[in-house]
A protein has these predicted regions:
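Active-site neighborhoods and metal-handling regions in enzymes and metal-associated proteins
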Residues: 5-185
Length: 185
């Protein structure tokens, strides 16, 4: 089943890194289950052609971490899977580069939306002009969550990107996850 395929490796790596326990129960989703946000069943059989999504975290020194990654169970992407993976990887890289002290905390989100929208258009999933895709948020059919969240004493520290209609600026030592995704069932 999904959970047993990755959970023991996740726990092993957490302990090797100095953590004694997870910050939440890992999500391990194969195939179409990976398109369900916060999927909790974790009990389906994974097929050789499936992608597997692992969303896991651990606590270290009272701080909770979180990371999501997707990989082919066979070890090799199909051509279609690779094309989508590369768009998500580019969104990850560009969004990470957008985290600069003094810049808006909205920059990584906006960057991920732009990169993913262009990628979905290039791959033929969206046909509209890029400006329309972004303005109408048409990408939300495939990318329906935020780029990430703050890391802190809770898994999802309650820290918005804006305050009183003003965008919050990055400060030194602020930490957030960067977890873009494209979900195609």
């Amino acid at each position: 089943p999904e959970y047993s395929s990755a959970a023991s490796d996740v726990y092993k790596r957490q302990r090797e890194g100095g953590s004694n326990f997870p910050s939440y129960t890992p999500i391990v989703a194969g195939g179409s289950n990976a398109c369900i946000l916060h999927y909790i069943e974790n009990n389906k059989t994974i097929k050789e052609s499936d992608l597997v999504l692992v969303d896991a975290g651990c606590e270290y020194d009272y701080y909770a971490s979180d990371i999501t990654r997707t990989f082919p169970i066979s070890g090799k992407f199909s051509a279609e899977q690779k094309a989508i993976y590369e768009v998500v990887l580019e969104a990850h890289k560009k969004s990470t580069e957008a985290i600069i002290v003094g810049n808006s905390c909205m920059n990584p989100q906006k960057t991920s939306e732009e990169v993913i929208s262009q990628g979905l258009k290039d791959l033929g999933f969206l046909k509209e002009p890029l400006e329309e895709i972004l303005e109408k948020k048409l990408f939300r059919e495939f990318y329906y969550h935020k780029i990430g969240h703050w890391i802190g004493l809770d898994v999802h520290d309650d820290s918005p990107y804006t305050y009183k209609d003003e965008e919050i600026k990055f400060k030194e030592n602020m930490i957030m996850t960067i977890e873009p995704g494209i979900y195609i069932n």
